[in-house]
A protein has these predicted regions:
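The feature captures the beta-strand-to-loop junction immediately N-terminal to the Walker
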Residues: 31-33
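Hydrophobic anchor residue at the start of the ABC signature
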Residues: 146
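Conserved ABC ATPase "signature" region
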Residues: 61-66, 103, 110-127
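Catalytic Walker B motif of ABC-type/P-loop ATPase nucleotide-binding domains
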Residues: 157-161
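A short, proline-enriched helix->beta-strand linker immediately N-terminal to the Walker B motif
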Residues: 151-155
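Short coil-to-helix segment of the ABC ATPase nucleotide-binding domain corresponding to the Q-loop/switch region
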Residues: 92-101
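Conserved ABC ATPase signature
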Residues: 132-136, 140
Length: 168
């Protein structure tokens, strides 16, 4: 697995220039002060923000290239993301949050639930499945967000301050 990120992303007066490559098995930490573009970079890889120029390529598949009008929808990318603070869908149950990625890929609810069972057990979420996100502690919500990011077996896992507020 290789991720090649060679792009510029512009948002208003902010411009982020990226020229990085990552290989399978690498663990990379992006560090910098507030407002330096760390989350923006992750959002571009996840497909939540389109690149302005350049390209983003994962295993020879172009995910985003403005010049060629190529943009793979975030739900179809082999990328999982855990947002800072979890960011669960408030109108969905915990189970619906966990299986969201599979459902977005047209997998039936019953099959998605079966596929999710291992993660549900590993993360200790069985008792929480019918609850709403507002009923969870910060750590519980973070575990749900991590399970949701892993459910599609992504090639790349992006973590935006995933340990903040995590229960011990």
């Amino acid at each position: 697995m290789t991720l090649d990120a060679h792009f510029t992303l512009t948002r208003g007066s902010f411009e982020l220039d990226v020229d990085l490559s990552f290989n399978e098995g690498e663990v990379v930490a992006i560090m910098g002060p507030n407002g330096s573009g760390k989350s923006t970079f992750l959002h571009a890889i996840a497909g939540l923000l389109p690149v302005t120029s350049g390209s983003l390529v994962l295993d020879n598949q172009t995910l985003d290239e403005a010049a060629k009008a190529v943009f793979i929808d975030p739900t179809q990318r082999p990328v999982g993301i855990v947002f800072q603070g979890g960011l669960l869908f408030e109108t969905m149950t915990i189970l619906e949050n966990i299986i969201f990625g599979l459902r977005a890929r047209k997998i039936k609810r019953t099959e998605a639930t079966v596929q999710a069972q291992t993660l549900i057990n590993q993360f200790g979420l069985t008792e929480l499945l019918q609850r709403q996100p507002r009923e969870l502690s910060g750590g519980q919500a973070q575990r749900v967000a991590i399970a949701r990011a892993l459910i599609t077996k992504p090639k790349v896992l992006l973590l935006d301050e995933p340990m903040s507020g995590l229960d011990t």
